[in-house]
A protein has these predicted regions:
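Single conserved hydrophobic/aromatic residue that forms the stacking wall/gate
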Residues: 2-13
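PLP-dependent class I/II
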Residues: 10, 16-20, 30-381
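Short phosphate-coordinating micro-motif centered on Lys-Gly-acidic
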Residues: 26-27
Length: 381
């Protein structure tokens, strides 16, 4: 995140202190009514219930506490943000990766993954491991920048309804909208088709400041109540003072323009990096948000080459679930991850949040890293 793009939010902090929030109360609502009202204005669907979490990770953790049991499968995108994979492992569950393209998880691959996991469950006496959750990033996916299209939402919903007619037995779908208002794509959700099976989480860390530690969470009433019950075992509720600060920011025109400007700048940096990479004959998907995924032939060699030039990127291996299905029906080994789609193969994550990361020199180095092999790396050195 480029903090220089958020300087205009400081005046909103200075004006804070109108004290609309509930003070010294253990019985107030878990989300301020005035905040919920303003959030619902641009939420991607009309949810039954809403609450607040202390960031997207906190919301994910409480949701997993409520719905994931040890031994369960949790279907994720591949590649997937490593912290999410770590959270799944910490709950004693198993991440199962499904490849994706520029519009998110591939419906055919999800279909095959559900078929495979269900057949394995039925093959075990008394039932084996169940799929309890499907984790998705609806826009500005980390690390690929992919965002759902309306067509992809319909296709994924159709696959799920084919496996779970009328929604009976359907895993909980959890959407992590981690980039929130700095994503250039419109907010969207599978809840537009499957409202009773989706928990949608929107973070405000990248848009309004990480120290707010705030994310809004929506879903069917019973799911939201189960998540609130998990939070009562710890912090109890999210500070209503912080909720009021977020409300003031969302209602403030200057803050709105600051966030909008940041969104446009990040989008411009994505487009600029795409053009610079094309000049280097490297055509990769550059989507939305702060990151892009560069497929590489040899990850260790690529990382060494970039480190020699002082360019920091994230190694791709931690983004890949150890269990994952191929992008096409020819990949029988679910653990190999050997799909035809680049997003499911070896790669590195590049962050374009800072202006200095977007220039000809970086693009040339990334193109070289994408093609490098151990042999060419040795020759280069």
């Amino acid at each position: 995140r480029d903090f220089c793009l958020s300087r205009g939010l400081g005046d909103v902090y200075k004006r804070q202190g109108t004290h609309k929030a509930f003070v010294n109360s253990y019985d107030g609502p878990t989300i301020l009514p005035m905040l919920e009202q303003i959030l619902r204005r641009n939420w991607p669907y009309e949810p039954e219930a809403m609450t607040m979490a202390s960031g997207a990770g906190d919301g994910l953790a409480h949701t997993m506490n409520a719905f994931v049991q040890p031994g369960d499968f949790v279907i994720t995108e591949a590649p997937e943000y490593p912290l999410i994979l770590d959270m799944i492992e910490a709950h004693g569950a198993m991440a199962f990766g499904v490849p994706m393209d520029g519009f998110g998880m591939l419906p055919d691959a999800l279909d095959r993954a559900l078929t495979m996991l269900e057949s394995q469950r039925l093959a075990v006496p008394h039932g084996g491991h169940q799929v309890s959750m499907i984790l998705l990033q609806p826009r500005a996916q980390n690390p690929t920048g992919a965002s759902f299209s309306p067509q992809r939402i319909d296709a994924l919903a159709d696959v799920l309804l084919a496996h779970y007619p009328n929604g009976v037995g359907m895993p909980l779908i959890v959407e992590d909208d981690h980039s929130g208002d700095v994503a250039n794509a419109y907010a969207t959700s599978l809840a537009q088709r499957l409202p009773q099976h989706v928990v949608h989480i929107r973070s405000f860390s990248k848009s309004h400041g990480p120290d707010l530690r705030l994310a809004a969470l929506s879903g069917p009433e019973d799911a939201v109540e189960a998540i609130i019950a998990q939070r009562r075992l710890g912090s109890g509720w999210v500070s209503r003072f912080l909720q009021e600060i977020l409300y003031e920011m969302l209602a403030d025109k200057e803050a709105f323009h600051t966030v909008t400007n940041a969104r446009h700048i990040y989008a411009t940096r994505q487009k600029t990096m795409h053009a610079l990479l094309l000049r280097q004959s490297l055509d990769v998907h550059t989507g939305d948000g702060l990151n892009l995924w560069i497929p590489v032939r040899d990850e260790p060699a690529a990382l060494r080459l970039l480190a020699e030039q002082g360019i920091r990127v994230a190694a791709g291996k931690p983004f890949l679930p150890s269990l994952r299905i191929s992008a096409d029906a020819t990949g029988a080994d679910a653990g190999a991850g050997a799909g035809v789609d680049a997003h499911a193969s070896r790669g590195i994550r590049v962050t374009i949040a800072q202006q200095g990361a977007v220039n000809e020199q970086v693009a040339a180095a990334l193109a070289q890293a994408a093609a490098v092999t151990p042999k060419t790396s040795t020759n280069h050195s």
